[in-house]
Amino acid sequence: MNKIIILLIILLSFDIISAAKKFGRKGIRTLGDNEVLLSDGAIRGTVTDTHRVFYGIPFARPPIDELRYEDPQPPKPWSYVRDGTKQRDQCIQDCKLGKGSCSEVGTSEDCLYLDVFIPRTVNPGSKVPVMVFIPGGAFTQGTGSCPLYDGLKFANSSVIVVNVNYRLGVLGFLCTGLLSGNFGFLDQVMALDWVQENIEVFGGDKNQVTIYGESAGAFSVAAHLSSEKSEGKFHRAILSSTPYTVGLKSQTVARGFAGRFSSKIGCDLEDIDCHRSKSPEEILAIQKELGLAIGDKILDAFTIWSPVVDGINVNEQPLTMIKQGTTHDVPTIIGDNQDEAILFVYMTYKNVVIPSSYRTMVHVLFGIANGNKVLEHYPLPGFLKDSRPILSKLLTDYLFRCPGRYHVSKSAQANESPIYHYQYKQVLSGGHSFEACEGLVCHGTELPMVFNTYESALDLDLEEEEEEFAEQLNNYFVNFIKYSNPSHPNGLPTPKVWNPTTKTTNTSLVMKLGFEVKDLITNDPKCDLFDSLSYNGYTKDQNRMRKSKK
């Protein structure tokens, strides 16, 4: 009897080895099943009639204790079947991003997990294109595990969606002489490594990976386009509402903010043990207190904490590399919303901004001579009238629209891969959670339409023509993810042909009901002015906080 048992064990071992060889180090346990075997262990997900989803897959070791303020480390293998039916905590933050944009399960330093949405019928040999979504939130808020970014719609269109988390704020970007300040960015790189290692288990094609980000997520995508660390780990890119002009932090600026933070929390800048002794609650409280000081660039207020240009992980400012033609040459979509800056201006200035204050802001931002040129295009309103509307238009152009146009123009000249541009102009019906955005197309307005989560995440009841618009919008993105062409003839139906901008054509797609195709580059004196001033090239006497004259 014992010999028979031993023989059965040996035969079973051969079967396991055979299966492992068939699928590499990993393989799906039963086709159509809810369990998969990853490189680090097995995980059980949820199966529905239309798709499968695996929540809370670890792509790095928890960055806690001695791993706080360290580059991400590979996860430890596990020997049990991990529960992937529930979302994990978002990274430490005080999320105020609005309905549907924050996690419903809490926060933790143990947050380096990703969620995978898969078409129901795929198997390990399907070679389905993959979209990795990097959420925004000024590098201090945001999570891939929220209702807004549910990947069901993409999965139903035969795209695998991977939503990632990464460390935020101080915990993600504290830069000292000893610390790079790029932990959050390297978390994203490790997530891309995980995709290369594991996505075939889910039926994905590791050679067809699109990275897609919005706002700070788009700036992250721009950094990946500029980083040797990310080369070859993605093959297409989508950047929505990229605040290029804000810039990533230089090491000098990043260390300045780190020094102030260290003083407030009671640690020497280089005393990492002291920093590791502080609770997440203490860190978050001091982080929220920290603002600009005399000598800081005004635009640093948008992202006090961000990836750092260190010459190793992030080689240079993305817009500088775009100008030089040295970014990774991959098919790209880039675009922005009609009223991007309204949200930021009205959240910062809750009361009327009088014209004299507006003029001072422009002069501080651009210097007096260049500021006067800017005021010719964005003139002062009437006496004592509110300047916030014109300030919003200026910042929409200067932070988002014009540098986006610059990116498209330079890449079309330097790269072989196609680049597509859009302008999103569809007002979100059913109201906006922020009063100043009512009837406008604010930052982030496109997201519930692209993901088709307007009902599930925002409880919006759209008109039939708006639902059709959202369907068509998603089709453009799906076609690009599959074919590098949003209007590919073999793709899903779209109402207009969206051609790339090239060395000789300047096409842009206006995203609103009916869609329109228009010229992007020419006849735009406002952007021409900002191009001539540059977006990151101000002297030390400009664009900085100053002491007010008595």
From Swiss-Prot:
Record's keyword terms, sorted: Cytoplasmic vesicle, Disulfide bond, Glycoprotein, Hydrolase, Membrane, Serine esterase, Signal
Domain of life: Eukaryota
Known glycosylation sites: 156, 506
Subcellular localization(s) per the UniProt record: Cytoplasmic vesicle, Esterosome membrane
Signal peptide coordinates: 1-19
One GO term describing the cellular component: lysosome
Predominant subcellular localization, coarse grouping: membrane
Disulfide bonds: 91-111, 267-274
Record: active site: 215, 340, 443
Gene Ontology MF term list: carboxylic ester hydrolase activity; hydrolase activity, acting on ester bonds
Entry similarity comment: Belongs to the type-B carboxylesterase/lipase family.
Descriptive protein name: Crystal protein
Organism: Dictyostelium discoideum
Lineage of origin: Eukaryota, Amoebozoa, Evosea, Eumycetozoa, Dictyostelia
